[in-house]
Regions:
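Active-site neighborhoods and metal-handling regions in enzymes and metal-associated proteins
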Residues: 1-272
Length: 272
C-alpha cells in the first residue's frame, strides 16, 4: 500500500533528505586518490550525527556501516574498507539519514582522478536517466512509466539495466511501497497518488545487465566485471507534479560544477 504524506510530513522528509545531500557534499570535498572508503564512512557517520540525525543504513538488515560504497564493477551495497581509492576509479556512494521519524536516502557516483571516457559517459547517461524517470512521476502515470523511461533512455546507449535491484517508497521506513524498477512497460504498475514519496535510483551497467552477489553477502557486482553507475533522488508528488526533496547542489558546490538540472523539479528555488 502506498503511504501518502501530508505537506508537513514531506517537509520533515525534505530535512532528512537534505542532511544526506549535505553529507554527500562533505564527502565530495574529501574524496580523492589515496583516501579509503572506511575513512569516508567514519566522516559521514560523524557528520550525520552532528546534524541531529542517525545513519539510516547502520544496522539496517544487519549492514555494518553508514555508507554503501561501491567502486567500479560493484553496483550497490559495497562495504567500506581500508583499500585506498585510485585514479580511474568510479564509486557509487549511497547514504541515508533518519531524523524526526523519517528517512532520507540518496546516492551519487563520483569520479576519482582521470576516468576512462566510456566510463565518464556511463555516469553522465545514468544521471540524465534519473531525471528522465523523475519527469514521469506525476498524477495519471503508473510505476512502470518511470522504469520504462529510464530503460529506453539507457538502453538506447547500449547499457545494461539491472533488474533485481529497484528504487522504493520512502518514509518512516527506509523501504515502503511501491517498488520502483528501472525497467518496465508503460501503463503498468500502481497508479501514482498525491503525497507519495519515492527514491528513484537508476543502477546502470556499462555491459551486461546481469549481476552477482559477493561472498560477503552484501556487495553486488556486474557479472562481466565492467563498471556500473548509480544515482538516486528522493522525490514527492506535490500538486500532481514531481518535486525533488534531495539535491546534488552540495556535491556540485564542492566539485566546482554549475548545473540547473534540478530547477524544473522545484516549486521554490533551493538556497544553500
Amino acid at each position: 500500500m502506498i503511504i501518502q504524506k501530508s505537506r508537513e510530513e514531506i517537509e520533515l522528509m525534505r530535512e532528512s533528505a537534505l542532511i544526506v545531500s549535505k553529507t554527500l557534499g562533505m564527502i565530495a570535498s574529501e574524496i580523492k586518490e589515496g583516501v579509503t572508503t572506511l575513512h569516508l564512512d567514519k566522516l559521514a557517520e560523524e557528520f550525520i550525527r552532528d546534524h541531529g540525525a542517525v545513519p539510516s543504513f547502520l544496522g539496517l538488515y544487519g549492514f555494518p556501516n553508514s555508507l554503501c560504497m561501491s567502486p567500479n564493477a560493484q553496483v550497490v551495497h559495497g562495504i567500506p574498507n581500508n583499500k585506498p581509492l585510485e585514479s580511474g576509479d568510479v564509486i557509487s556512494i549511497d547514504c541515508g539519514a533518519f531524523k524526526n521519524g523519517y528517512h532520507g536516502d540518496h546516492a551519487y557516483s563520483f569520479e576519482i582522478g582521470e576516468v576512462a571516457p566510456e566510463t565518464k559517459k556511463l555516469l553522465q547517461v545514468t544521471k540524465e536517466s534519473l531525471y528522465v524517470g523523475i519527469r514521469e512521476l506525476k498524477l495519471g502515470n503508473r510505476v512502470e512509466d518511470v522504469g520504462n523511461a529510464i530503460q529506453k533512455f539507457t538502453e538506447s546507449h547500449g547499457y545494461g539495466v539491472v533488474r533485481e535491484l529497484v528504487g522504493h517508497g520512502l518514509g518512516q521506513k527506509m523501504h515502503e511501497d511501491p517498488e520502483m524498477p528501472n525497467y518496465g512497460k508503460r501503463g503498468r504498475g500502481k497508479l501514482f497518488v498525491e503525497g507519495m514519496v519515492v527514491a528513484i535510483e537508476p543502477m546502470i551497467n556499462l555491459g551486461t545487465k546481469n549481476i552477482k552477489q559477493h561472498k560477503d553477502g552484501w556487495t553486488i557486482t556486474t557479472a562481466d566485471g565492467k563498471p556500473s553507475a548509480h544515482f538516486e533522488h528522493d522525490v514527492a508528488i506535490i500538486d500532481g507534479k514531481p518535486e525533488i526533496l534531495s539535491t546534488f547542489a552540495y556535491v556540485y558546490q564542492a566539485l566546482g560544477i554549475v548545473s540547473n538540472e534540478e530547477d524544473e523539479f522545484r516549486r521554490i528555488p533551493l538556497v544553500i
